[in-house]
Amino acid sequence: MRLLMIWLAMAFRAMAVELPPKELDCMEKNAYFEAGNQHYEGIRAVVAVTLNRVESDIYPDSVCEVVWQKYQFSWTHDGKSDIPANKKQFAKVKEHVAHALRDYKGGYKLQNSMWFHNHTVNPKWAKHKRKIATIRDHTFYGDH
């Protein structure tokens, strides 16, 4: 039984998008600051957008470069600490990110969504995009 459990754990891990530690840290922080107050679906959507950008030809080729690209994610230029304050919540986000990476490799790409915004703002760029989904307090978009 123990051998079966080990094999299943290894197989499950092999099905996930694998990121180097620094890239994973950028992804986890992006998920925490953008959707850390949300359930799994919101975090999974932020992970999908981030990876969709990495895979696209119009954004940088790494998670950290996508996350830290100027004015792409609000938390990276808000003047506040980039260290997650709520360690318990950050631990939960890390779990959700791990699951989201498996979902992404399994085909969940939120219809190739590349942009999102919080409902508290109304960005001009949104009117030029195709609305794909609303998940909690975020709306996600793709190209027309």
Label each region the model flagged.
Residues M1-A9, R13:
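Sec-dependent signal peptide recognition
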Residues V17-H144:
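Bacterial extracytoplasmic/cell-wall-associated proteins, especially those involved in peptidoglycan
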